[in-house]
């Protein structure tokens, strides 16, 4: 199977007995759920503005200049991408983990360009590492089952 096809192939949820006895399977499921739910929740919030009411302040002007429309329009696009990324993680965590890691890298760059958000950028770097770990664990899990 080609590398691309293998990365996109859906990976099933580990069997209950595997989850009970294998810490690696537990870590895989924990990361899979977290990196599916969090992007979907934050993506939905770009529209609902329940958690944060001023998302555009996190968008670097350099990025906003590349995206048509206002900063708020850009945040709606970002929200749609985040929702899609969460769904991809749920179905294909090996590819989804890489997708979320790349997205987080872009967020980190934007936060550093805006300035004043280095603490959030550092937190997002930790999330980026977790997304990469999810992708690697998904690769190992796909081989075992």
Specify the residue positions occupied by each region the protein language model found.
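Membrane-interface extramembranous regions
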Residues: 2-145
């Amino acid at each position: 199977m080609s590398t691309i096809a293998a990365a996109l192939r859906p990976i099933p949820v580990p069997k209950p007995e595997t989850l009970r006895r294998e810490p690696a399977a537990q870590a895989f499921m924990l990361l899979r759920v977290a990196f599916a739910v969090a992007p979907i929740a934050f993506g939905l919030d770009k529209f609902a503005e329940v958690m944060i009411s001023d998302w555009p302040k996190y968008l670097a002007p350099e990025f906003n200049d590349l995206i048509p429309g206002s900063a708020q329009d850009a945040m709606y696009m970002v929200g749609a991408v985040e929702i899609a990324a969460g769904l991809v993680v749920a179905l294909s965590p090996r590819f989804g983990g890489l997708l979320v890691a790349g997205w987080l890298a872009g967020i980190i760059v934007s936060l550093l360009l805006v300035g004043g958000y280095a603490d959030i950028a550092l937190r997002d770097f930790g999330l980026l590492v977790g997304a990469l770990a999810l992708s690697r664990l998904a690769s190992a899990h796909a081989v075992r089952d």
